[in-house]
Swiss-Prot record:
GO terms for biological process: symbiont entry into host cell; viral penetration into host nucleus. One of its GO terms (cellular component) is helical viral capsid. Coiled coil: none annotated. Encapsidates the negative strand viral RNA, protecting it from nucleases. The encapsidated genomic RNA is termed the ribonucleoprotein (RNP) and serves as template for transcription and replication. The RNP needs to be localized in the host nucleus to start an infectious cycle, but is too large to diffuse through the nuclear pore complex. NP comprises at least 2 nuclear localization signals that are responsible for the active RNP import into the nucleus through cellular importin alpha/beta pathway. A motif (Bipartite nuclear localization signal) lies at residues 198-216. InterPro entries: Flu_NP. Residues 8-21 have a biased composition (Basic and acidic residues). Late in virus-infected cells, may be cleaved from a 56-kDa protein to a 53-kDa protein by a cellular caspase. This cleavage might be a marker for the onset of apoptosis in infected cells or have a specific function in virus host interaction. This is Nucleoprotein. One of its GO terms (molecular function) is RNA binding. It is found in: Virion; Host nucleus. The lineage of its organism: Viruses, Riboviria, Orthornavirae, Negarnaviricota, Polyploviricotina. A motif (Unconventional nuclear localization signal) lies at residues 1-18.
């Protein structure tokens, strides 16, 4: 669908891939999972966690954070050069939750980063295993995408909060590499570029000198990544123009926002991978499962099978609904924050509700929250069917959508029509066709107007029974079109704050 310049699967991006065949890719991804699992087991031993405590998703998040922080070289360097009161740049840690006398207790742990790096490398046969680190970053990013709506960030860059379906990966760190770039949505790339251009407008030296050259090549690289996500010639031509601008300014920002809006109908290709918390991989490895030998894929049945047989627990606040907490984590596990809820309900086999209807806050517990009233419960992460993840945006068509999110970004390669509210989207395009790109703009608008309601995306693709490992019998779901398809529907999800 979208030529990413080089035709490499994202498993190959994930594996420094020289072209590998499917078996090699599966083994290579499996090796990465093994490493995360072994590291997690070792950390649970260090922290003296019981089996139950080791399967607590909050402990998993703390342990994942610790290793990500231990390997964050840029930040580590910054912390050493700008020492701040009460922060030891050589240490990392966080809250670990333990069950003591029938109650959950919070314990703050602190480790030398050097020690954490040693444990990580040891679990990964002496390598830095950057891919495993990126994998955990993408899991955190997917969890953020499911938990928070980035309204403020969108408004700050001059975009519209209704464009939230384009914001996948907006909290991924800069160092997340090619695998990270593959999962970023159109809006995320546009936002990064706008921030850059704004700095250039405010800071005369931003594009100048030795540093400016690096900045410029980063700018062009980001433009090319974004261009690779677009699937129409006119959208790509627009990106060439933004990239080649001598002195990027407001005209480029306008073009970028225009192209982001257009992506609500002429969707870009964004990769989706099921990245699971470390506390899923750990127990699987501990039970003797050899991911490298068996092979593993982030985009096929494997994560579904793994979740089918995993026990994960979560702390629950007094007025939260454990079923809703489960839905939040399930969606995060499958990178499905912007997928059509009707399809998700079908795959999961239970109703998937919009974010605003869920009685649950984020998975993490703040340090000032009272532990006395905390309970824990099992997260229900199993599914009825499985489906193949997609990296194409699907072709487009129209349906009434909501006040909040007005389009979807498909996660699963399954036949359906893709809802978006054409009248709302097109209203944003009235007027401003003058300016230097009018021909491209006119072409893009013409294509958007031509998008038809009856068009079906992913024709003939279906979901599969969990017993159908080779994906031989696709089941094409039928949907109740009267149901709401958007997750962030006129929503009150919390904001994401760093």
């Amino acid at each position: 669908m979208a030529s990413q310049g080089t035709k490499r699967s994202y498993e190959q991006m994930e594996t420094d891939g020289e072209r590998q065949n499917a078996t090699e890719i599966r083994a290579s991804v499996g090796k990465m999972i093994d490493g995360i699992g072994r590291f997690y087991i070792q950390m649970c031993t260090e922290l003296k966690l019981s089996d139950y405590e080791g399967r607590l998703i909050q402990n998993s998040l703390t342990i994942e954070r610790m290793v990500l922080s231990a390997f964050d070289e840029r930040r580590n360097k910054y912390l050493e050069e700008h020492p701040s009161a009460g922060k030891d740049p050589k240490k990392t840690g966080g809250p670990i939750y333990k069950r003591v006398d029938g109650k959950w207790m919070r314990e703050l742990v602190l480790y030398d980063k050097e020690e954490i790096r040693r444990i990580w490398r040891q679990a990964n046969n002496g390598d830095d295993a950057t891919r495993g680190l990126t994998h955990m970053m993408i899991w955190h990013s997917n969890l953020n995408d499911t938990t928070y709506q980035r309204t403020r960030a969108l408004v700050r860059t001059g975009m519209d909060p209704r464009m939230c379906s384009l914001m996948q990966g907006s909290t991924l760190p800069r160092r997340s590499g090619a695998a990270g770039a593959a999962v970023k949505g159109i809006g995320t790339m546009v936002m990064e570029l706008i921030r850059m251009i704004k700095r250039g407008i405010n800071d005369r030296n931003f594009w100048r000198g030795e540093n400016g050259r690096k900045t410029r090549s980063a700018y062009e690289r980001m433009c090319n990544i974004l261009k690779g996500k677009f699937q129409t010639a006119a959208q790509r031509a627009m990106m060439d123009q933004v990239r080649e601008s001598r002195n990027p300014g407001n005209a480029e920002i306008e073009d970028l926002i225009f192209s982001a809006r257009s992506a609500l109908i002429l969707r870009g290709s964004v990769a989706h991978k099921s990245c699971l918390p470390a506390c899923v991989y750990g127990p699987a490895v501990a039970s003797g499962y050899d991911f490298e030998k068996e092979g593993y894929s982030l985009v096929g049945i494997d994560p579904f099978k793994l979740l089918q047989n995993s026990q994960v627990y979560s702390l629950i606040r007094p007025n939260e609904n454990p079923a809703h907490k489960s839905q939040l984590v399930w969606m995060a596990c499958h990178s499905a924050a912007f997928e059509d809820l009707r399809l998700l309900s079908f795959i999961r086999g239970t109703k998937v509700s919009p974010r605003g209807k869920l009685s649950t806050r984020g998975v993490q517990i703040a340090s000032n929250e009272n532990m006395d009233t905390m309970e824990s419960s099992t997260l229900e992460l199993r599914s009825r069917y499985w489906a193949i993840r997609t990296r194409s945006g699907g072709n487009t068509n129209q349906q009434r959508a909501s006040a909040g999110q007005i389009s979807v970004q498909p996660t699963f390669s399954v036949q359906r029509n893709l809802p978006f509210d054409k009248s709302t989207i097109m209203a944003a395009f009235t007027g401003n066709t003058e300016g230097r790109t009018s021909d491209m703009r006119a072409e893009i608008i013409r294509m958007m107007e031509g998008a038809k309601p009856e068009e079906v995306s992913f024709r003939g693709r279906g979901v599969f029974e969990l017993s159908d490992e080779k994906a031989t019998n696709p089941i094409v779901p039928s949907f109740d079109m009267s149901n709401e398809g958007s997750y962030f529907f006129g929503d009150n999800a919390e904001e994401y704050d760093n």
